[in-house]
Regions:
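Glycine-rich tight-turn/loop motif centered on a GG-T
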Residues: 1, 31-33, 37, 91-103
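Conserved structural scaffold segments of CAZyme catalytic domains across common CAZy folds
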Residues: 1-11, 17-24
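Alpha-helical scaffolding segments of alpha/beta enzyme cores, especially the outer helices
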Residues: 2-5, 63, 67, 106-113
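Short, well-ordered coil/turn segments that N-cap beta-strands
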Residues: 6-10, 73-75, 118-121
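Hydrophobic faces of well-ordered beta-strands that scaffold small-molecule active sites
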Residues: 10-14, 77-79, 124-125
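Glycan-recognition surfaces
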Residues: 20-59, 104-197
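Active-site-proximal beta-alpha loop/turn segments in soluble metabolic enzymes
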Residues: 46-51, 87-98
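An active-site-proximal structural segment forming one wall of the substrate-binding cleft
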Residues: 50-80
Length: 197
């Protein structure tokens, strides 16, 4: 690709656990979304969450990602999940108290297949910041986005506390603009680079 010819690596940002209610997928398979029977599904960010407890959904997600990875020279994937799961029900889980556990096992299954099929692919996971920062996710992705707060001074505290349990190499960070969009703090570019690295 042109990116590789420039000496860089190419990455894509995915949010594969979501579905838009106006999408072809949802129109053809509304049962793929998590929803409580007899209730209108709860939207967040104009999205519904796909039911990873459902084997068909896991296969669909894997096949879609595989199609992209097979037709592009992708080195890096950022796997994001930006909304809360509000309709906690799946007809594929006999004990609804196990819903979240089964959902995450479904996610692990997809990530396992991807990492086995594409061992050189770098995956960074993210969930509205660091909501999935745990050893289970690190098994499949050696980097996790720690927080959506990218102000370097704020990040010092976030990254310090994460370092009590996790290696620094697992903490993903970006260099942000100054003044920072959330805190309006101005910091030198060198500080922003030092904290992000």
């Amino acid at each position: 690709t042109r990116i590789h010819k420039m000496g860089m690596k190419f990455g894509l940002w995915f949010e594969p656990e979501m579905v838009n209610p106006k999408s072809k997928l949802y129109e053809q398979h509304p049962e793929y979304a998590i929803q409580i029977k007899g209730r209108k599904p709860s939207l967040g960010r104009n999205q519904l969450v796909l039911d990873l407890c459902n084997k068909e959904v896991r296969t669909y997600i894997y096949d879609q990602i595989k199609d992209v990875l097979d037709h592009a020279q992708i080195d890096f994937v950022k796997w994001d999940m930006n909304r809360h799961i509000t309709d906690m029900y799946s007809s594929f889980v006999p004990n609804q108290g196990m819903f979240f556990h089964q959902y995450i096992l479904g996610l692990y299954e997809i990530l396992s297949k991807i990492t086995q099929e594409y061992p050189n692919l770098m995956i960074e996971t993210c969930s509205s910041g660091g909501n999935r920062y745990d050893l289970g996710m690190l098994y499949y992705s050696p980097q996790i986005w720690a927080s959506d707060n990218t102000d370097p001074i704020e990040r010092l505290a976030i990254q310090e506390r994460l370092s009590y349990l996790y290696p620094q190499s697992t903490i993903s960070a970006h260099v942000s603009l100054a003044p920072h969009a959330q805190t309006l703090r101005r910091t030198p570019l060198a500080t922003r680079f030092n904290v992000a690295s």
